[in-house]
């Protein structure tokens, strides 16, 4: 979200790379099917655009800049795009799971952050475990 490589490419696009990296539909469907599993139903797995950059969103101005360029963004992080670029170069399917720790610019972000650490370990493990199982056993989608 914070890269500018001139007017020849889209805002945020690195020259020689796609403007956006799209996960394979099959992986997105498997990820969303996790919502139907009892161990994951409270985790609210969603699909959407994650924008990635080199600075932490800690002001209204930074958040507004992101929303001006990417109004459909559902998450902001500092890692996903670099991982997606490497996967693109090596032609490796990629999907990113983000556990949202806080909503930028909310008054209760400190409490959101501390509550996040209570939830992250079990939630991340369950999502990862079940997603890997779905990749190796596609029939599990229909049994949930």
PLM region descriptions:
Residues 2-21, 90-96, 117, 135-144:
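Noncatalytic linker/hinge segments flanking ATPase motor cores
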Residues 34-44, 83-92, 130-134:
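A structural motif corresponding to the C-terminal end of an alpha-helix
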Residues 1-70:
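Mid-sequence, gly/pro-rich, charge-dense loop/helix-turn segments that line enzyme active sites
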Residues 55-109:
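A C-terminal functional module that forms or caps the active site or interfaces directly
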Residues 22, 26, 61, 78-81, ...:
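Conserved active-site and cofactor/substrate-binding residues in soluble primary-metabolism enzymes
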Residues 104-142:
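His/Asp/Glu-rich mid-to-C-terminal helical/loop segments that flank catalytic regions of hydrolases
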Residues 1-4, 75-79, 103-106, 122-127:
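Short, surface-exposed, polar/charged, turn-prone segments marking secondary-structure boundaries
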């Amino acid at each position: 979200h914070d890269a500018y490589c001139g007017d020849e490419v889209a805002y945020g696009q690195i020259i020689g790379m796609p403007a956006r990296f799209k996960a394979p539909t099959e992986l997105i469907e498997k990820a969303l099917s996790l919502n139907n599993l009892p161990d994951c139903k409270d985790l609210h797995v969603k699909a959407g655009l994650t924008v990635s950059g080199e600075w932490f969103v800690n002001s209204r101005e930074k958040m507004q800049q992101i929303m001006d360029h990417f109004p459909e963004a559902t998450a902001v992080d500092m890692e996903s795009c670099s991982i997606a670029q490497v996967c693109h170069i090596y032609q490796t399917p990629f999907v990113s799971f983000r556990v949202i720790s806080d909503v930028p610019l909310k008054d209760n972000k400190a409490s959101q952050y501390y509550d996040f650490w209570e939830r992250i370990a079990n939630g991340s493990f369950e999502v990862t475990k079940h997603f890997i199982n779905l990749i190796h056993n596609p029939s599990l989608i229909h049994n949930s």
